[in-house]
Amino acid sequence: MTVDKTKKTIVIGHKNPDTDSICSAICYANLKQITSGGEYVPGRAGHVNSETQFVLDYFGMAAPKETQTVKTQVKDIEIRETKGVAKNISLKKAWNLMQDAGVVTIPAVTEDNVLEGLITVGDITRSYMNVYDSSILSKACTQYTNIIETLEGAMLIGDEREYFKEGKVLIAAANPDMMEYYIEKHDLVILGNRYESQLCAIEMEAGCIIVCEGAGVSMTIKKLAQERGCTVITTPYDTYTAARLINQSMPISFFMKTENLITFDTDDYIDDIKEVMASKRHRDFPILDKNGKYKGMISRRNLLGPEARM
């Protein structure tokens, strides 16, 4: 049988231990340590009496650490170390991370590894269905960095660290005369290489224009955009593809679950959390260490065969 050398096994005698029980645990743990190469430590299930303490002192041995219970704890089972992410990453990036890791839930954490929320595959797919709200990109306070990354584009004018936080998203499919009636201040306009359309969008005080199909932008347009405070981004995608992809640039913080999160501690007992897990529709549950920091994830599957502690 292959021994998992990363797991610690506690060797314990009977309750209310006498000298035989304590000494047997010490000897057997030492024997297993030598013969198997695994980590075996002696334990005791009760107080050390005076006779046993005399024997231990005589041979210069420390008393085994008392084990209050041998019930399996969360730290005794396999915890999936799903890496936490920043809450401002895009939906597209979160989706790609899930696919690469083969998971359906990703935790959002702070730089200090404090859990802030959970985003699931279901949350991401539901976000794609919200196609009728043309202002959702600004409501989500989407950073231009995310937009550039999602559209595989480049920023010509503006600061990619800034946020699109006011206005709607629209496609400039009509001629400039018609555009004047539906472009409003702060809007994000997706358009092509037509000089007149770019000029009209900037003059109508659009907050950002996205020029598609890798089209060049004239110096006149760049200068005017700079003067009017209009961000200019280029993308190799056509207008249809850019319009479909842009909602994937929204931060996961707008869709992730942040309230009433069900978490468990590494010291929680499996018997205590089974009922909670069974009563919830969640597939994955975050695990926190004794300092309240994010440790990893477990699911019902992890509870099928937890290893005994002794």
Per-segment meaning from a language model:
Residues 15, 45-47, 111, 121, ...:
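Short, ordered loop/turn segments at secondary-structure junctions
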Residues 103, 114-130, 237, 286, ...:
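Short beta->alpha transition motifs characteristic of CBS
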Residues 133-134, 222-257:
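Long, charge-dense
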